[in-house]
Regions:
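Short, Lys/Arg-enriched N-terminal segments with co-localized hydrophobic residues
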Residues: 3-15
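Conserved, structured core segments of small domains
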Residues: 16-104
């Protein structure tokens, strides 16, 4: 039974689509994010350990965020993003989700 469960999870993971997320930080995000940063990073680590998050971070100018995620659909990813403390506290002010086809 355990083998079937592992196989099922692997199959579901392989069925997940990849998405690119591009968004914008609030003004003075570097300062405003500080009280929430530890909670944010801890959550992201858990999501990454679950193979949902591939990568996420700010652009060098720190005005924008860029990420790659595995998810079943855009609604699932939207829910995931909007449960993040950065979204709840207004550190992330908007975002767009794009289905992505990884060529290699």
């Amino acid at each position: 039974m355990q083998l079937l469960s592992i196989y099922s999870l692997y199959y579901l993971y392989k069925k997940m689509e990849k998405f690119v997320v591009f968004g914008r930080y609030c003004e003075d995000a570097i300062i405003k994010r500080e009280p929430f940063r530890e909670q944010h990073l801890k959550r992201l680590k858990n999501i990454k350990d679950s193979d949902i998050l591939v990568t996420l971070g700010p652009t060098k100018c720190t005005k924008y965020l860029f990420g790659i995620f595995n998810a079943n659909d855009t609604n699932e990813l939207k829910d995931l993003i909007e449960k993040d403390i950065y979204w709840e506290k207004g550190i992330w002010v908007n975002y767009d989700i794009y289905p992505w086809i990884q060529a290699f």
